[in-house]
Amino acid sequence: MLHWLGYQLLEIYGPFRLLKSHLFLIGFGTALAASLTWYWLPRFWKRLPSDLGRLYAVGANQSMGKPVGAGVIFVPVFVLVSLLVLPIDLRFLEVLAVILLVMLEGYLDDRKPGGLSEYQLGIIDLGLALLGAIILCQFQPVQIWLPIIKADVLLPVWAFIPLATALIWLTTNATNCTDGVDGLSGSLSAVSFMYLGGVLYAILGHPGISEYLLVPYYEDGTGWATLSFVMTGCLIGYLWHNAPPSLVLMGDAGSRPIGFLMGMLVLASGNPFLIFVVSGVILVNGATGLLKVFLLRFFKIGIFKKVRYPLHDHVRREKGWSNPQVLVRFVLLQIVLTPLLLLFLFKVR
């Protein structure tokens, strides 16, 4: 909205041209989202349900009694700030609407004693992921660019929708599984969104740089980058209160929308393999456990039998890592690995 307003007010007062700058709006949106989340969380978390702990989770008793479901506070902040700083585009409005639905699903799980069943959550996640995939492609073929090879691939609708649905479902649940240590899911996600935002804004949203690196240029890349940085701001405000020892937990109302948005942004980049680059630690920590359960439950195939998942539970119980050690080491791994993998992704083609 501010972007449109900048054009209307430019003739009245010259400095209003700042509202036409995507970089200014990204910075303003990030700071505003962080400030509003930081301010509103402690004023509303007394109304949130209390955490009841998780069966078999390491250190679950440390979280019991704390307010859970903070996503129901910071996700609306994300939506409102995004509406303020995004260019007017129907597809972005559709994305924000579905993210609110994902938040509501998570909040229902947070509020219900014992939560929703795994199958209920899985089916709802699948339906919402399908909706996200349809929003991305608009029932049109989608151009995909890949690592190593320079040629682009045009995916037909019948191929893109199931593949995109699977990726969004995976990121939604992997991020949810990572939410088990104070600050971990929020910090890893914030790092991922910062890298994603940088790629979407500075490379894929820039005609000169994208041409130099032989990757597609997306005119709406700056809009997707804005979503990424605004969510980063919300996570910064949340992490202020979630730093160990935490005062509030994001719950499914936060982790599921975060994972959903992450999958959407990766697909908006045109390269689904980017998920391994910006969210590798989240996938290893959470998604490998999902794979282990899936193979064992449906095919009676046991893998990683000596490894406890999510991986953060394994290193705490088997390696004796403290919660701060898990947080710092996992985040450092993501910070160091992502630039190296980005270099490979964009230069080895």
Regions found by a protein language model. Name each.
Residues F193-G197, G289, T338:
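Hydrophobic transmembrane alpha-helices of multi-pass small-molecule transporters
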Residues P324-L345:
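Final/C-terminal transmembrane alpha-helix of multipass membrane proteins
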Residues F28-T30, P156-V157, L296-F298, L340-L342, ...:
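A short, structure-level motif marking secondary-structure boundaries and short turns
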Residues D220-G221, I275, L296-K300, R349:
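Short beta-alpha connecting loops at secondary-structure transitions
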Residues G115-Y119, F294, F346-K347:
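Short flexible/disordered coil segments
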Residues S50-G53, G71, G280-R329:
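Membrane-proximal soluble regions of multi-pass membrane proteins
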Residues L2-V284:
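"…together with the soluble PPM/PP2C metallo-phosphatase catalytic core" -> "…together
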